[in-house]
Amino acid sequence: MASLIRMPYPLILLLILIMATASHSHPMQGFCSVESDPELTSSSGKILIKHGTVVNAHHKVVADVYIEDGVVVSVRPNIAVGDDVKVIDATGKYVMPGGIDPHTHMEMDFMGTVTIDDFYTGQAAALAGGTTMHIDFVIPINGNLSAGFASYVEKAKKSVMDYGFHMAITKWDEAVSKEMELMVKENGINSFKFFMAYKGSLMINDELLLKGLEKCKSLGALAMVHAENGDAVAEGQRRIIDLGITGPEGHALSRPPVLEGEATARAIRLASFINAPLYVVHVMSIDAMEEIAKARKSGQRVIGEPVVSGLTLDESGLWDSDFTTAAKFVMSPPIRKAGHDKALQNALATGILQLVGTDHCTFNSTQKSFGYGDFRKIPNGVNGIEERMHLIWETMVESEKITVTDYVRITSTECAKIFNIYPKKGAILEGSDADIIVLNPNASFRISATSHHSRSDTNVYEGKTGKGKVEVTISGGRVVWEEGNLKITSGSGKYIKMPPFSYLFDGIDKADANYLASLHSPVHRTAAAF
């Protein structure tokens, strides 16, 4: 980087352009190789996992699990099988539902570039880390939902595991309202995201948010918000730049926790006004968490999703003297000061926050360097889809903050219930999809960009170690991760449609009726003589 600083600025831009072009010309550059087997596109037949502790969200038992044609057939002790069955010995290990990541951005156009992980490399990383399904955010094309959906369907053709879609809403008119109906009724989308940040691009105003909340409620779809005050963030960025602070630390300084807390509170109150369930994505601060806690205590239906970066990191990396190191930590909302992480862990342990995502949105160091000299141009996003299951085990289970059954709930089951795909996903029960992991609580892991499966050349969790390692991943009845080897095939993943009206909508109609009955209006008055 020192040599870059001595170069004339136009040459720096030219060098960056050349590097970026080279990166896009070689789509597999920097990606750990995996074995590809065309026969893996169909279910690999019969599997018996024996002698493990089978863990669901509310129960664990020592039992065998028999899988056939991609489905769990039986869960009980001492299952006898023939020689044509692959047997996995899970003695002393946990057999759990594969992780479900509710928050990812694969191959997303953002801030003048495209996230470096696509539906092949990002999902490969997920499987190596024990996640067997994710839900990605579709970004409309010029506000058009159908065009955005078609684009993501095309991107996802290379999928190697199951996935679903959320849909972002970036503008409002009658056409968008009609398209939301289409997305829910025909395309299997039951959640819509509203950005309260990114002024001038994705950001919506309160009027649009209100209309969106009303529409979501009528469709039985869950409204989601990226909660930061976008107007104040823009002012904060201007203020920090005027102070001469242009490096990655300026990103955190320009969008402090109070702006996340304010937007979270505003979204919660507007959702209360409409009586619609609300899902707050990537809760990164005490300020936002406390607003969610107050709302839930009052009985409001609010879901809080922390992400693994906010639970396990602090903002100190943003002050690193090396630009590449500091820039890799830039995401929004920002990673916060030490103390916020522990508070979020405690909120997750006590049920204030319900499930863990990643906001996996990766850019390589070349892409991050677009913001050298102006933090506002650093593409926002970090990795996490491969690291989530390991880091949450180490941070929450090894520390005895939560139980093993809680771990299954926050990494898999709760997500499946919120998005209405339980018990097909998020459980090991007869008839459930055979998306299963075997985790060895005594094995250790170490995280490094040199060994991960993401295409990114950096890793925000670099050097982190711990106990609790996923040794086997089964996706759709296929063993795709075993003995440190991936065996995947492009196109083997399935799109999972998610029906509307999850449990979060139970009792909504009754609450509305009670509200109307409480108004004692209109009052019938006699005409007065004037």
Task: Describe every region a protein language model picked out.
Residues 26-49, 53-98:
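Histidine-rich, glycine-flanked metal-binding segment
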Residues 52, 70, 92, 103, ...:
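Divalent metal-coordination and catalytic microenvironments
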Residues 7-25:
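Cleavable N-terminal signal peptides of Sec/SRP-targeted secreted and luminal proteins
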Residues 85-158:
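Metal-associated gating/positioning segment near the N- to mid-region
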